[in-house]
Amino acid sequence: MALKHFLNTQDWTCSELNALLTQARAFKHNKLGNALKGKSIALVFFNPSMRTRSSFELGAFQLGGHAIVLQPGKDAWPIEFDTGTVMEAETEEHICEVARVLGHYVDLIGVRAFPKFLDWTYDRQDIVLNSFAKYSPVPVINMETITHPCQELAHIMALQEHFGTTDLRGKKYVLTWTYHPKPLNTAVANSALTIATRLGMDVTLLCPTPDYVLDERYIDWARQNIADTGSTFQVSHDIDNAYRGADVIYAKSWGALPFFGNWAMEKPIRDQYRHFIVDEAKMALTNNAVFSHCLPLRRNVKATDAVMDGSNCIAIHEAGNRLHVQKAIMAALASQ
C-alpha cells in the first residue's frame, strides 16, 4: 500500500475528509488521548508561525506524542532542493538525505514553506513540500505551502458548528479578496476554493480584476468538484452582486499572480482596491452571513472592527479548530 500523505484535500476522498472531521469533533470533546503514544513528529518551518506551530506541538503532546521543531537556515542546516546541482553555495545538505534521515527518527514530518514570490511558474511546483513527500519514508503533512489544507478543515469544521449540520450543500459561499499593503500567499484562498466546491457549496470567487483570479490548477479543481456535486462556481468582480444573499463570507488577501517578481508594479494597482474591505454595509447585503478569516488579520484594512467583533464572526473558532483537525490528521497518518 502506498504511503499516504496530507498534502492537499483534493487527494483525499470526501469520506476520508469527513472521517477526519468526525475524529476532530471527538478530540474537541475529549482533549487527551494516546493515539500518538510513542510517536514523534518533526515540524520543519521555513517560515514563521504562531497558530500552526503552537497547535501542532500541543496536539502531539495531548495525544501522547512528541514534537520537535526545526528551522532550516536558523537552528538546522540550509537545505538544497534542486536536483543535479553542484552544491557550492549556501546550502549544506540535500533534501534526499534530510527527509530520509528524519524518517529514521520520527513517525511524521510537517512542512511549512511559503512561495518565494519571484516566479509563480516556479512557486506553483511546490518543490519543498513535494520533495519531502518524494524522499520521506514517513507521512508528510502540509503545514502551509501554496495550499493550506489544515486551515481548510478547521474552516469547514467551524462552518458546520455554526450552521449545526455537517451538510453544507447549497450554501452560498463567497471567497472575497481583501486589501493588504503587502502581496500575500494564495494558499488559503486556493484551499478555501477547493474545499467549498468539494462539499457542494455554491461558490463565488470575488476579486478586483482578472489578474487576481487564482491559479488555473485550483480553478480547474473547483470546476471538477462542482461537476461532481451539482453545485455552482463563478468568478465575480462585482462586490454588491457577490455579497447579496450570501451565507458565508470568507476573506483573504493575495498578490496578483502575473506580477510575481514585479511587486513594485502591482502595488499601485492593489492600492486602488482598499474598498474591498469587509464592512457592515457589505455584510448587510448578505443572508445574515457568517464571516471568517484564517488569521492573522489587519483590522480596519481587511475587515472592520465591527465585523471582527460581531456575533457572526467565527474566525477565533476556526483558529481554535486547527488544534483538533491537526490531531485527527496526525492520528490518521500515524496509524498507517
Swiss-Prot record:
Site (Key residue in conferring substrate specificity for N-acetyl-L-ornithine versus N-succinyl-L-ornithine): 92
Binding-site residues, N(2)-acetyl-L-ornithine: 144, 252, 295
Protein name, UniProt field: N-acetylornithine carbamoyltransferase
GO cellular component terms, semicolon-separated: cytoplasm
GO MF, one example: amino acid binding
Broad class of the protein's primary localization: cytoplasm
Species of origin: Xylella fastidiosa (strain Temecula1 / ATCC 700964)
Modified residues annotated as N6-carboxylysine in this record: 302
Subcellular location: Cytoplasm
Listed InterPro entries: ArgF, Asp/Orn_carbamoyltranf_P-bd, Asp/Orn_carbamoylTrfase, Asp/Orn_carbamoylTrfase_sf, Asp_carbamoyltransf_Asp/Orn-bd
Signal sequence extent: none
Family: Belongs to the aspartate/ornithine carbamoyltransferase superfamily. AOTCase family.
Pathway note: Amino-acid biosynthesis; L-arginine biosynthesis
Keyword Transferase listed: yes
EC number: 2.1.3.9
Entry's Gene Ontology BP terms: arginine biosynthetic process via ornithine; citrulline biosynthetic process; L-arginine biosynthetic process
EC class (word): transferase
Gene designation: argF'
